[in-house]
């Protein structure tokens, strides 16, 4: 990772996915690696078949990585949506503050 003009060069996986600039990529790959080791090792201990255990490990990596990726991206999208709603609410509160349209003012029966 070299510093050039204040920017860091990201690490790429397979020359495609830039881990530092892609949200949830690092965590998904780490979870996938742990899932592949666990799935492959458990399958090997249960069956003692090396090639099949390797295949199960690769499948475990893909499933765990994709599952972790989609879960993280869903939570990020949900959080962004909630932040957008709160931001609009704050903007409306500032806009209508002190006017007759202010929803926080209690209505009295004077009118």
Curated annotation (Swiss-Prot):
Gene Ontology biological process terms in this record: mitochondrial cytochrome c oxidase assembly
Stretches of the chain found on the membrane's Mitochondrial matrix side: 48-56
Annotated keywords: Membrane, Mitochondrion, Mitochondrion inner membrane, Transmembrane, Transmembrane helix
GO CC, alphabetical: mitochondrial inner membrane; mitochondrion
InterPro entries named among the record's database cross-references: Cox20
Record localization: Mitochondrion inner membrane
Mitochondrial intermembrane side: 1-27, 75-111
Transmembrane segments: 28-47, 57-74
Membrane-protein topology: Multi-pass membrane protein
Main location: mitochondrion
Source species, domain of life: Eukaryota
Pfam families: Cox20
Function: Essential for the assembly of the mitochondrial respiratory chain complex IV (CIV), also known as cytochrome c oxidase. Acts as a chaperone in the early steps of cytochrome c oxidase subunit II (MT-CO2/COX2) maturation, stabilizing the newly synthesized protein and presenting it to metallochaperones SCO1/2 which in turn facilitates the incorporation of the mature MT-CO2/COX2 into the assembling CIV holoenzyme.
Sequence similarity: Belongs to the COX20 family.
Protein name: Cytochrome c oxidase assembly protein COX20, mitochondrial
Organism: Danio rerio
GN (gene name): cox20
């Amino acid at each position: 990772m070299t510093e050039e003009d204040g920017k860091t060069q990201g690490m790429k996986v397979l020359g495609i996915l830039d881990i530092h600039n892609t949200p949830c990529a690092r965590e998904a790959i780490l979870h996938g690696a742990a899932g592949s080791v666990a799935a492959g090792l458990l399958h090997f201990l249960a069956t003692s078949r090396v090639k099949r255990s390797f295949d199960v490990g690769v499948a475990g990596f893909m499933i765990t990585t994709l599952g972790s990726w989609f879960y993280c991206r869903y939570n990020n999208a949900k959080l962004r949506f909630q932040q957008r709603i709160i931001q609009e609410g704050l903007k409306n509160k500032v806009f209508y503050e002190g006017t007759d349209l202010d929803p926080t003012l209690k209505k009295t029966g004077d009118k």
